């Protein structure tokens, strides 16, 4: 760390201990003295190590060194006036530092490796800063004094904020730490009030934390600028946010620290200091705005203070100072405002080292203020800005930030003088005072900018250009257009250069240039280009002249001549104007294009309509003799205007050969004989019009029209004689037309009609009717004649429209002609006769007063609203009383009968008064709202309500309406459910609660509604329905339809309660009228009110509680339980055992409790749901909803029903034996009930019941029952039962029963029965049967029977445990039993066993085959061949047959040594430890583990404390997850199991692979079969895999990381 820097508290490691102030005048050290790194003690090293962990923005308070060895204190340099400084704390006195005394003035730079030479202005002698050698982090401590704000911030980088006690003016790049401010008593008092948060009132400012001078380990956190490579002043502009210092993990030399040359952090830019940022060096090179407007050179008075103490902050603790320092670094409005540049003299833009260009301050890194935000305000002081203030540039190779500081400490006159000299050399050729960048430093970086980004040598943008620099226009070659006018129209925008029209000549027929086919350009030009023909124009006849817009200073082509030019001006005209062609040549010497000197007049259309755009040679020829009608600028020497007295465009049209159609006034080419628009004939030319030459004229002749006859500019817009304006549409018409060409309005003034009537298709013989006649002023009509009324016309007094003489009525408003009898007009004046005739109302038609529809005269009623015709009797209609006007409304004249005929109402149709819907004549009610037809008896009803006239009324479609009816009579807005024979309505989001007792309605498709009446609801989605039915209707048996995932509870008030909770997706509904069995259809079903058994349809997750015997439909993995009544027909049951039991509906994940007393209720499809039946004489059990990870404890007399309890421990301690609770433990919950309860175990929960209760284990539950109960285990549950019960194990469950019961093992469940029972093992379930039992093992299940006379049907790889029963197929298991089924092993014949080992039975009369246990290890005293056990160990101590089905990662342990009748070998559920006594839930604290528990009697669950060995994370007696397994039988390949292969552990028994586990079992297992990842024990997290006996595994030793020196 820093070897020098301020005098810190002495004694390394002493912290903020108060010590006396000492003066350390460390002038004895040489500038190049080595750092004292080797002299550190142990305490200082510890302190340095602690400091290296602290980030750099906190280290600035650690890095105060004990003494300031790098500063030379001289009494002559310091004006010690402590009293004056304390009195005038706010005023900072300026003192002069002599440069002679400053030769060895040292200041901490910014932690660079090599000392930078400090160039003084007057001496240019490099003085070395010895603090720059090892001062790595002393620069990161800004002072907390606001007095340092009055520095030039340019000279005070944000990095170098350490207050210095040196009297010499520092030279380094530090500005905030140039002079150590001595705080007066006021500031100390302020600091005392700032924070006294430290526990001890230490003068933390006086006693900072002690640090050693040289720290061997660099700080872990350091500011960004500490790592910057450049020594330019811009390093101070980079942010001081803490960045990770890579040098803490090793650098070139420990003494270098983060000042190592190789210490370039990730992301540092090689071209400018700091990280690579957006915009690169441009972002770094930004102007800094000082906190105060003082400029360099700045002279400040140093207050005397003890040099030993680096900082005075009163009693502010170091932690408080760090907090305040962090606050200073944060962005604040005040800090942001300080960055805003100001143009006032108070805040003059400070000089930069290189250039004074103010840049965007938002790009600039934040210059931190080293003062806490709580001290006194620093007010800017006005300074006088010198006029000759310019930039001082030091032409040295040293970094400019170093050389800048010394140079600014000279006197102002010296400084200004030197800056003037430098300015003359650097920026003498520029008009602004911003010089170029200085010479790049020797390190490759630009010494002025801090960036070395690849930039131009000129680093600045010049705001002005020299006046003499003007861009010359490019000399463009004359490139002819390689296309001819035969393919393209010739664009000719030029008047020919050199043409000068005579002031007296009007038309000039061309002589010389018109004989050329190339001279095809019209004389009209835009004002900009002067087009000259090139050589290729004469070479290719018919080619258009090139035209180019003018470019300045272009040279003329030497090959141009008068003959090669396209000229519309004759040579005679040139001669008459006395224009020399030499002058034209001189004017055109500038280029082939020249700006026009006059603005040509005329229309663009005149040029575009010229024959030059036509490919006809005659037109091209004739176009060359143009009559220029524009006043052209004669190209004389004087450039005077000679306007030609030619009208605009008339002569040019004639010269172009255009003629105007007399019919449509379209201008046509001269070659067109007919108008191209209306096909009218071309009019014959008259003597007043110009003759267009059909061939090139051969002589220069003037036009025959005298100048006096040339029309003026106003004559152009005069109307030709005889033309008239339409009074209707104001379109100008020709004189010969009698109707307007636009609206066909007759010509006004019928008195002139006979004389002016000329067919529009004939050409005019009258000179006044010529289209070009408006060009001559002799045929012009005066303005008063133009607007004169036609003779005989009359003006309407109503609409002021001019009418013809023969019209007796106004053509616009139909008003009569004056002089006749007037009629009051009833229609609004429109004025368009021809247009209104099309919309004229037929005679006799009338408008409806109600809907304003026009009707035919013969119609007596309105065709739209059927209102009576005015004058007839009005008919009252419904709620709409038609308002009849006493005065008949005048018919409107704006109707169109033809269009309305399409929408005409059919005869006899009538509109509903309520909904305004049109109905057919034969309809007596509205088809929409069923309102009676007007005239019939109206019924009182609400708006839009349905009318049920019969029992079979159509259903209504209702959205979101909640209907509730409690009576059987029809109510307004009531739903149709509950009414006799009413077809179910489609209801969306509707909740209908109907408690009618007589009739039950059919309910159809319902979305999300809850129907709680006694009738079964139809298709319902996701709603819970709860209904209370009356005692008289409780005998009805209802069947719920397809319900999806809901629980329907029915609280019966009588033992005969019947509830139909349809809360899920009910597809079918059952009505209580018939015993119609409905399957999963959308049809409604009926069921009788009688107690006849009904079949419930497909239901998803729904529970129906019925007291009656009902056959349920498809049940997926659900156990059906019936108690007393005879079973009825059941539908498809997936994985369901129906043996004397009723079928339940398919319930998906929901418990379904049903009454048990009279008959078994039918439940729908139940996935993992138990349907326990209830006794009819017991109270209704309460239901607990889904409890995730909660522990439910029911102590009331009524047994509770816990549907889905994940990680919950459901314990029912009710002592009342009269209540039969229906508990449903779902997914790993343990339900312990000491009272007769019906546990429903779902997915890995263990249920222990000591009372007669139907238990239903679903998906990996263990349901041991010692009382008569119907246990139903689903999917990997173990249902051992010692009492007569119907157990059905589904999908990997083991159902063990010692009494005659029907057990169904489904999919890997083991069903063990010691009594005559029929066990059906399905899919890798082991069903050991009693001697008189028939075991049906399906797909890898083991049917073990203590009696050899058991009839076992092993299906697909299941092993029969009897001596005569074939063994089940165990994937990777030794084949030890005889098998006759595919994949089973037989004693006489061993079949193929995948990776299994054939094993013969040893000591047992009946060999049991462990089925396919995926990853489980089966350990029993009898050598049982373990099946495919996935991560699971099955241990059995029974001498009888032990069979475990497919258990996925679960451990099963039977600790009872008695026969199977007492305790069956349980088949654990998914990851569950099956203990016949108790099995805890996942996360519940019980005596038996659930999830991946070890095989012990009472192994606690995950995270629970128990006296038994823990399950998850501890070593149980049986190995848990990650603990060694001790299989006593042939074990399969335990993939990742704690088997015999001990990774890093000892194994006492040769076994299989065990990863980091210790197998403490002493039994020698047979050669292991394939056990895929079979680890029966639970996951022992952090138990080192040790069993109860101490293992030889040494515990891991975790070492803390230490950083090497």
UniProtKB/Swiss-Prot annotation:
The keyword Membrane applies. It comes from the Eukaryota. Zn(2+) 4 binds at residues 848, 851, 862, 865. It is found in: Nucleus membrane; Nucleus, Nuclear pore complex. GO terms for biological process: mRNA transport; nuclear pore complex assembly; protein import into nucleus; RNA export from nucleus. Disulfide bonds: none annotated. Residues 27-44, 194-203, 397-409, 421-432, 497-517, 697-711, 1499-1518, 1581-1595 have a biased composition (Polar residues). A zinc finger (RanBP2-type) spans 655-684, 720-749, 790-819, 842-871, 906-935. GO terms for cellular component: nuclear membrane; nuclear pore. Gene3D superfamilies: Zinc finger, RanBP2-type. Residues 249-1556 are annotated as: 33 X 2 AA repeats of F-G. Zn(2+) 1 binds at residues 661, 664, 675, 678. Binds at least 4 zinc ions per subunit. Zn(2+) 3 binds at residues 796, 799, 810, 813. Keywords: DNA-binding, Membrane, Metal-binding, mRNA transport, Nuclear pore complex, Nucleus, Phosphoprotein, Protein transport, Repeat, Translocation, Transport, Zinc, Zinc-finger. Residues 1519-1529 have a biased composition (Low complexity). Contains FG repeats. FG repeats are interaction sites for karyopherins (importins, exportins) and form probably an affinity gradient, guiding the transport proteins unidirectionally with their cargo through the NPC. FG repeat regions are highly flexible and lack ordered secondary structure. The overall conservation of FG repeats regarding exact sequence, spacing, and repeat unit length is limited. Component of the nuclear pore complex (NPC), a complex required for the trafficking across the nuclear envelope. Functions as a scaffolding element in the nuclear phase of the NPC essential for normal nucleocytoplasmic transport of proteins and mRNAs. May be involved in the retention of unspliced mRNAs in the nucleus. Probably mediates tpr anchoring to the nuclear membrane at NPC. Possible DNA-binding subunit of the nuclear pore complex (NPC). Belongs to the NUP153 family. Interacts (via C-terminal domain) with the nuclear receptor kpnb1; the interaction occurs in a RanGTP-dependent manner. Associates with the Importin alpha/Importin beta receptor. This is Nuclear pore complex protein Nup153. The lineage of its organism: Eukaryota, Metazoa, Chordata, Craniata, Vertebrata. The gene is nup153.
């Amino acid at each position: 760390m820093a070897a020098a820097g301020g005098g810190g508290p002495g004694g390394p490691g002493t912290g903020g201990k108060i010590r006396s102030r000492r003066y350390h005048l460390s002038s004895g050290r040489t500038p190049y003295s080595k750092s004292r790194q080797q002299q550190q003690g142990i305490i200082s090293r510890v302190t340095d190590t602690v400091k290296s962990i602290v980030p750099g923005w906190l280290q600035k308070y650690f890095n105060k060194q004990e003494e300031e060895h790098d500063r030379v204190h001289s009494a002559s340099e310091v004006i010690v006036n402590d009293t004056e400084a304390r009195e005038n704390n706010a005023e900072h006195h300026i003192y002069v530092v002599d440069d002679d005394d400053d030769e060895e003035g040292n200041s901490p730079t910014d932690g660079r490796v090599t000392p930078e030479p400090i160039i003084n202005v007057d001496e240019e002698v490099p003085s070395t800063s010895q603090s720059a050698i090892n001062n790595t982090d002393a620069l990161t401590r800004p002072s907390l004094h606001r007095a340092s704000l009055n520095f030039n911030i340019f000279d005070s980088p944000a990095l170098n904020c350490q207050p210095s006690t040196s009297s010499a003016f520092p030279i380094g790049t530090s500005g905030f730490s140039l002079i150590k401010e001595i705080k007066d008593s006021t500031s100390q008092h302020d600091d005392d009030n700032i924070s006294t948060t430290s526990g001890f009132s230490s003068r933390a400012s006086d006693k900072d934390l002690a640090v050693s001078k040289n720290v061997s380990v660099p700080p872990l956190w350091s500011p960004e600028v500490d790592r910057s490579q450049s020594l330019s002043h811009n390093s101070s502009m980079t942010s001081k946010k803490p960045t990770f210092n890579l040098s803490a993990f090793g650098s070139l030399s420990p003494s270098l620290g983060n000042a190592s040359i190789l210490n370039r952090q990730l992301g540092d830019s090689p071209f400018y200091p700091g990280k690579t940022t957006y915009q690169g060096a441009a972002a770094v090179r930004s102007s800094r705005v000082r906190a105060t407007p003082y400029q360099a050179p700045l002279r400040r008075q140093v207050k005397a203070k003890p040099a030993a103490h680096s900082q005075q902050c009163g009693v502010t603790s170091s932690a408080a100072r760090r907090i305040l320092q962090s606050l200073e670094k944060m962005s604040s409005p005040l800090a942001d405002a300080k960055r805003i540049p100001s143009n006032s003299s108070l805040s003059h833009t400070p000089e930069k080292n290189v250039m004074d260009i103010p840049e965007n301050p938002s790009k600039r890194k934040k210059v931190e203020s080293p003062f806490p935000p709580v001290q006194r305000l620093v007010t800017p002081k006005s300074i006088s800005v010198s006029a000759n203030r310019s930039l001082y540039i030091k032409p040295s190779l040293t970094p400019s930030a170093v050389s800048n500081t010394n140079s600014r400490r000279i006197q102002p006159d010296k400084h200004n003088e030197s800056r003037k000299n430098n300015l003359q050399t650097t920026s003498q050729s520029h008009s602004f005072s911003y010089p170029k960048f200085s010479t790049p430093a020797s390190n490759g970086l630009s010494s002025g900018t801090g960036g070395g980004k690849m930039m131009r040598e000129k680093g600045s943008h010049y705001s002005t250009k020299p006046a003499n620099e003007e861009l010359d226009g490019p000399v463009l070659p004359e490139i002819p257009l390689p296309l001819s006018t035969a393919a393209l129209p010739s664009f000719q925008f030029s008047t020919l250069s050199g043409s000068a029209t005579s002031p007296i000549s009007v038309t000039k027929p061309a002589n010389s240039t018109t004989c050329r086919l190339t001279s095809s350009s019209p004389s009209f030009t835009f004002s900009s280009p002067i087009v000259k023909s090139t050589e290729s124009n004469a070479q290719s006849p018919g080619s258009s002249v090139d035209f180019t817009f003018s470019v300045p200073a272009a040279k003329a082509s030497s090959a141009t001549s008068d003959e090669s030019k396209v000229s519309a001006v004759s040579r005679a005209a040139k001669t008459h104007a006395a224009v020399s062609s030499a002058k034209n040549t001189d004017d055109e010497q500038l280029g082939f294009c020249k700006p026009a000197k006059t603005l040509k007049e005329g229309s663009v259309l005149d040029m575009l309509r010229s024959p030059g755009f036509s490919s006809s040679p005659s037109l091209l020829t004739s176009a060359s003799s143009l009559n220029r009608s524009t006043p052209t600028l004669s190209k004389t020497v004087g450039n005077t205007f000679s306007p030609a007295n030619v009208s605009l465009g008339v002569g040019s049209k004639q010269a172009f050969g255009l003629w105007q159609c007399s019919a449509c006034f379209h201008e046509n080419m001269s070659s067109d004989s007919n108008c191209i628009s209306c096909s009218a004939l071309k009019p014959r030319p008259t003597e007043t019009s110009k003759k267009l030459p059909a061939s090139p004229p051969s002589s220069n002749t003037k036009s025959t029209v005298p100048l006096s006859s040339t029309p003026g500019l106003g004559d152009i817009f005069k109307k030709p004689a005889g033309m008239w304006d339409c009074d209707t549409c104001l379109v100008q018409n020709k004189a010969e037309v009698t109707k307007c060409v636009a609206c066909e309005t007759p010509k006004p003034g019928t008195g002139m009609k006979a004389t002016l009537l000329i067919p529009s298709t004939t050409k005019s013989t009258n000179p006044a009717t010529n289209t070009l006649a408006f060009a001559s002023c002799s045929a012009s009509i005066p303005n008063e004649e133009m607007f004169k009324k036609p003779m005989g016309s009359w003006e309407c007094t109503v609409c002021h429209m001019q009418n013809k003489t023969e019209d007796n009525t106004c053509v616009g408003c139909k008003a009569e002609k004056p002089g006749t009898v007037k009629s009051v007009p009833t229609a609004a004046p429109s004025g368009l006769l021809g247009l209104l005739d099309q919309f004229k109302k037929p005679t006799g038609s009338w408008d409806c007063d109600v809907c304003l529809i026009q009707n035919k005269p013969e119609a007596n009623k309105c065709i739209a609203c059927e209102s009576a015709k005015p004058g007839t009797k009005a008919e009252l209609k419904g709620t709409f009383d038609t308002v009849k006007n006493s005065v008949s409304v005048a018919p409107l004249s704006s109707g169109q009968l033809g269009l309305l005929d399409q929408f005409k109402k059919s005869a006899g149709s009538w509109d509903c008064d309520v909904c305004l819907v049109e109905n057919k004549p034969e309809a007596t009610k509205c088809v929409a709202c069923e309102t009676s037809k007007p005239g019939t008896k109206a019924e009182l009803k609400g708006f839009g309500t349905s009318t049920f006239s019969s029992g079979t009324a159509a259903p209504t479609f209702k959205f979101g309406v909640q209907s509730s009816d409690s009576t059987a009579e029809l109510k307004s807005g009531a739903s149709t459910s509950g009414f006799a024979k009413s077809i179910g309505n489609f209801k969306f989001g509707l909740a209908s609660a109907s408690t009618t007792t007589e009739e039950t309605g059919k309910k159809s498709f319902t979305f999300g509604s809850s129907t709680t009446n006694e009738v079964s609801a139809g298709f319902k989605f996701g709603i819970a329905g709860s209904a209370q039915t009356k005692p008289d209707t409780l005998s009805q048996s209802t069947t719920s339809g397809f319900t999806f995932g809901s629980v329907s509870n029915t609280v019966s008030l009588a033992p005969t309660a019947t509830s139909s909770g349809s809360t899920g997706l009910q597809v079918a509904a059952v009505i209580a009228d018939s015993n119609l069995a409905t399957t999963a259809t959308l049809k409604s079903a009926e069921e009788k009110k009688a107690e006849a058994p009904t079949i419930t349809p497909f239901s998803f997750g729904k529970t129906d509680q019925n007291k009656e015997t009902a056959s349920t439909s498809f049940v997926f993995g659900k156990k059906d339980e019936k108690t007393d009544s005879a079973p009825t027909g059941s539908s498809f049951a997936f994985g369901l055992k129906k043996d004397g039991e009723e079928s339940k509906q398919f319930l998906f994940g929901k418990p379904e409790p049903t009454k048990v007393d009279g008959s078994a209720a039918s439940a729908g499809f139940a996935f993992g749901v138990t349907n326990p039946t209830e006794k009819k004489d017991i109270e209704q059990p309460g239901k607990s909803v889904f409890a995730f990870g909660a522990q439910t404890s029911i102590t009331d007399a009524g047994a509770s029903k816990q549907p889905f309890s994940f990680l919950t421990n459901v314990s029912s301690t009710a002592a009342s034996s009269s209540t039969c609770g229906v508990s449903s433990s779902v997914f790993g919950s343990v339900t312990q009930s000491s009272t007769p309860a019906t546990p429903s175990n779902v997915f890995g929960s263990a249920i222990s019941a000591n009372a007669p209760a139907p238990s239903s284990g679903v998906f990996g539950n263990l349901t041991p029952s010692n009382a008569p109960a119907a246990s139903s285990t689903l999917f990997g549950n173990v249902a051992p039962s010692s009492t007569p019960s119907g157990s059905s194990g589904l999908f990997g469950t083991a159902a063990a029963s010692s009494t005659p019961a029907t057990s169904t093992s489904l999919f890997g469940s083991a069903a063990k029965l010691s009594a005559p029972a029929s066990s059906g093992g399905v899919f890798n379930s082991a069903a050991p049967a009693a001697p008189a039992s028939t075991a049906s093992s399906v797909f890898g299940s083991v049917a073990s029977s203590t009696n050899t006379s058991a009839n076992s049907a092993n299906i697909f790889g299941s092993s029969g445990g009897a001596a005569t029963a074939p063994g089940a197929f165990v994937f990777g298991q030794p084949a030890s039993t005889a098998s006759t089924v595919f994949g089973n092993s037989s004693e006489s014949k061993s079949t193929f066993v995948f990776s299994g080992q054939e094993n013969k039975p040893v000591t047992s009369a009946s060999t049991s085959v462990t089925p396919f246990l995926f990853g489980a290890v089966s350990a029993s005293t009898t050598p049982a061949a373990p099946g495919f056990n996935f991560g699971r160990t099955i241990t059995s101590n029974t001498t009888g047959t032990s069979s475990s089905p497919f258990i996925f990662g679960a451990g099963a342990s039977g600790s009872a040594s008695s026969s199977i009748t007492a305790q069956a070998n349980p088949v654990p559920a998914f990851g569950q430890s099956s203990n016949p006594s108790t099995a805890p839930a996942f996360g519940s604290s019980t005596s038996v583990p659930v999830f991946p528990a070890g095989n012990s009697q009472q192994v606690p669950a995950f995270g629970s404390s128990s006296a038994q060995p823990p399950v998850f994370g501890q070593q149980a007696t049986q190995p848990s997850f990650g603990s060694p397994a001790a299989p006593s039988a042939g074990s399969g390949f335990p993939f990742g199991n704690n088997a015999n292969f001990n990774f890093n552990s000892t194994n006492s028994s040769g076994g299989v692979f065990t990863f980091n586990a210790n197998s403490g079992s002493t039994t020698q297992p047979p050669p292991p079969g394939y056990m895929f990842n079979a680890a029966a024990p639970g996951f022992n997290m952090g138990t080192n895999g040790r069993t109860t006996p101490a293992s030889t595994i040494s515990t891991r030793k975790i070492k803390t990381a230490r950083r090497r020196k």
